[in-house]
Amino acid sequence: MAGTVQNFYDDLSSYYHLIFEDWEASMAGQAAALAPILVRECGTATQIKILDCACGIGTQALGLAKAGFRVTGADLSPRAIERARVEASARSLNLQLHFADMLHLNAVPETGFDAVICMDNALAHFSCDEDLAEAAAQIRKKLRAGGIFVASIRDYDHLIQERPVIQGPSFFSDDEGRRRIVFQVWDWIDERRYAFHLYITCDTPTGWRTHHGVSTCRAVLRDELTSMLEGAGFERVRWMLPAESGFYQPLVLGVAG
């Protein structure tokens, strides 16, 4: 998953917050959706040790740390990790951060986590079943027996039927009234894989400016991901759709056997 995916998130690290209408509110809202699941499965928030294995600039890690969880973050993008460090420091949050690909989570020295999370469709970046299965195995090794894995992924069971070519656009404005437009264009490569072009166009004092990045994803269906997690040693794998969880994407949960 490294290489071009890393470059995509390195380049996006300075702009990532702009894909949200209000990043601070999104951090709080996503933490509020995830916290009850984690507490129900693992216990008291302040005693739960979490690894966010695709933390990016910290959207979930920062929100959960602020909610009292003990959070360690890892990501394949060194620039995203550096941004997360800056954001954690600005909020006086104790967030341990590591540069680590999901295929090489041994770069994170700690083990025995109560929970590992992997949000924002990160699992879809794996281009083949073999790499996705290896990532699941790496994640299992980071968990204590009985620990929980929680991941979010797009609803590809639905999207694979429609094969959309655009997501959005979304129109936002900041506190100063400056507008921005965020959307994705999807170019389908084959039945499962697509290149997505992310556009963030901002109204600046010197005119409109656009950030454009390209990466690839693979549509992984729910039964496929369930089978891979079970093959990696997870038990009681189950799904929570947004109507149940309050999270913006479907969630998959599995207990480390």
Language model segments and positions:
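SAM-dependent methyltransferase
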Residues: 150-226
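A short acidic, Gly/Pro-enriched loop at the edge of an enzyme's catalytic core
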Residues: 107-115
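Class I SAM-dependent methyltransferase SAM/SAH-binding core
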Residues: 59-105
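Conserved class I S-adenosyl-L-methionine
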Residues: 1-56
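A short glycine-rich, Lys/Arg-flanked "PGG" loop and its adjoining helix->strand segment in the class I
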Residues: 133-145
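C-terminal lobe and adjacent flexible extensions of AdoMet/dcAdoMet transferase-like proteins
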Residues: 216-257
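A short SAM/SAH-binding and catalytic strip from SAM-dependent methyltransferases
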Residues: 114-130
